[in-house]
Structures are given as structure tokens and as C-alpha cells.
Amino acid sequence: MRTFALLTAMLLLVALHAQAEARQARADEAAAQQQPGTDDQGMAHSFTWPENAALPLSESAKGLRCICTRGFCRLL
């Protein structure tokens, strides 16, 4: 009886895993169709803190600029 329960549980896990892979493949395909032409090119974002920012900044942080690209940010 224990063997039957284990085999049933394993079969259920395999079936759920196959379903999850199919759903992930469909989600990846849909995402690729929604964004044509976007390869793995990094996107760059730039943030600049104005002198009159809402949060008080120390003298060393005034005019601080952050450049963020895919994977890391660096401060200028």
C-alpha cells in the first residue's frame, strides 16, 4: 500500500512539473511576442537628485547622480 501511495505521488509530481513547464513556455512565448525587437540589450536609467530635494541631503550627496544599467548601478 505504501508503494502504491509513493508511485501515485511521484506520478502526480511528474504531471504537475510537465504542466508548469508548458505554462512557462507559453508565458515566455507571449512575452517575446509583446516585445518585438528587444534583445538582451541593456537599458540605461539615469537619476539625478536636485539641490532642493524633499529629503535633506548631506553636502557630499548634493547633485548625486546614479546610472543604472542591466545588472548594476554606479554613482557619479
Curated annotation (Swiss-Prot):
Propeptide feature: residues: 23-64, 74-76
GO aspect biological process, one term: defense response to Gram-negative bacterium
Stored InterPro entries: Alpha-defensin, Alpha-defensin_N
Covalent link location (Cyclopeptide (Cys-Arg) (interchain with R-65 in subunit B)): 73
Sites of the Cyclopeptide (Arg-Cys) (interchain with C-73 in subunit A) crosslink: 65
Cross-link (Cyclopeptide (Cys-Arg) (interchain with R-65 in subunit A)): 73
Keywords of the record: Antibiotic, Antimicrobial, Defensin, Disulfide bond, Fungicide, Signal
Chain residue ranges for the region called Disordered: 25-45
Record location of the Cyclopeptide (Arg-Cys) (interchain with C-73 in subunit B) cross-link: 65
Expression across tissues: RTD-1 is expressed in bone marrow. Detected in promyelocytes, myelocytes and mature neutrophils and monocytes.
Keyword Isomerase carried by entry: no
Nucleotide-binding is among the record's keywords: no
PTM statement from Swiss-Prot or TrEMBL: Forms a cyclic peptide with subunit A (RTD-3) or with subunit B (RTD-1). An additional intersubunit disulfide bond is formed.
Pfam families, per the entry: Defensin_propep
Disulfide cysteine pairs (residue numbers): 68-73
Cellular component per GO, a single term: extracellular space
Residues spanning the signal sequence: 1-22
Function field: RTD-1 and RTD-3 have similar antimicrobial activities against the Gram-positive bacteria S.aureus 502A and L.monocytogenes, the Gram-negative bacteria S.typhimurium and E.coli ML35, and the fungi C.albicans 16820 and C.neoformans 271A.
Record text on subunit structure and interactions: RTD-1 is a cyclic heterodimer composed of subunits A and B; disulfide-linked. RTD-3 is a cyclic homodimer composed of two subunits A; disulfide-linked.
Homology family: Belongs to the alpha-defensin family. Theta subfamily.
Additional observations: RTD-1 is 10-fold more present in cells than RTD-3.
Name recorded for this polypeptide: Rhesus theta defensin-1/3 subunit A
Gene: RTD1A
